[in-house]
Each structure stands twice: as structure tokens, then as C-alpha cells.
Amino acid sequence: MDEKDVATQPQETGQNPRLSGQDEDPGRPEGAEAPPSEGALAPHARRSEAVGPKPPAPGGKLLSLKGDRAFQRLRKGRAGRGRYVSVKWLPAAELRVGIVVSKKVGKAVVRNKVKRRLREILRRLHLPQAHLLVVASPEAREADFAELFRDVVRALRKSGLVQ
């Protein structure tokens, strides 16, 4: 039988050789339950119903500092400066971080690399609860991870956030 012949042969009603039945799953053993059809998350993976922001887990994702007002408030915060970064912070109920890397640092790929490094450094430090702003200087593009790490710690010590 030719492929042309298959396409032109009349189909029996309700029968399509390419589609299986609605409840039919060839990979599922007979009698096994179908997965739940309520949304994209499985029951064990549903989001918790807890209210309010959760503090970042040690080694977890950092919360971002957002909104112009939050950045304006940080102008009155405590400051510290290193060779590659300057930091400002204010005490807060939770740790939130804003990272600023200007176009003077370089093109987008370089700026994003500096931001990723700074985010990882701050994640590793397990900082106290504060709103923290980290501004990278153009020289930060030449610093390797270890130099940047030492400089961030130095700036945070000068500002009084860490000992």
C-alpha cells in the first residue's frame, strides 16, 4: 500500500490512525491514573499560601531593590568605597540588593558579567538585613572574581555593614 493510497482512503468515523483515543496513552499501563489536569504545577509543587516576602535562604537568590523611591532613600544611607565598587545601605526588614553598572563599564556583555559576579559575591556573604546599593566603577571590568570579592568586602567594612 502506497502513502498516496492511505491519504485518499475514506476513514471510518471517529477513527484516525495518527491520533490515539482521548483517554488512550500507549506509555501508561492500563488502570494507571492520569496526571492531574489543574494548571502547570503538580500538587506537591504548588506555591505556598504564606503571606509576605520570604527571607532569602542562605546561598539562595537575592531579592532585588526596586523602585525609584527606594534608591532615593539610600542617598541618606551609610557609604563605603573600594577600588571597584561603592556601596550604600540602610537598615531594613529584609535584605534587598540593587546593583548599578553604568555604560562606562562597557558593552552589555561586560556589564552583565560584572553584575553576575557582584550578585554571586553578595549571595556568598550572607549579609544582615538591609537595603544595599552596589555601584560598579568602570575599572570593575578588569577585576577578576577574587579581586572584586575582596573589594566588595572592603567597601562593606568601611560602610559598617559587616565586621
Swiss-Prot record:
Pfam families: Ribonuclease_P. Keywords: Endonuclease, Hydrolase, Nuclease, RNA-binding, tRNA processing. Residues 8-19 have a biased composition (Polar residues). InterPro entries: Ribosomal_Su5_D2-typ_SF (IPR020568), Ribsml_uS5_D2-typ_fold_subgr (IPR014721), RNase_P (IPR000100), RNase_P_CS (IPR020539). Its EC number is 3.1.26.5. GO terms for cellular component: ribonuclease P complex. GO terms for biological process: tRNA 5'-leader removal. One of its GO terms (molecular function) is tRNA binding. The keyword DNA damage does not apply. Residues 1-68 are annotated as: Disordered. It catalyses: Endonucleolytic cleavage of RNA, removing 5'-extranucleotides from tRNA precursor. Belongs to the RnpA family. RNaseP catalyzes the removal of the 5'-leader sequence from pre-tRNA to produce the mature 5'-terminus. It can also cleave other RNA substrates such as 4.5S RNA. The protein component plays an auxiliary but essential role in vivo by binding to the 5'-leader sequence and broadening the substrate specificity of the ribozyme. The open reading frame (ORF) for this protein entirely encompasses the ORF for the 50S ribosomal protein L34 (rpmH). The two start codons are separated by four nucleotides. NCBIfam families: rnpA. PANTHER family: RIBONUCLEASE P PROTEIN COMPONENT. Consists of a catalytic RNA component (M1 or rnpB) and a protein subunit. This is Ribonuclease P protein component. It comes from Thermus thermophilus (strain ATCC 27634 / DSM 579 / HB8). The gene is rnpA.
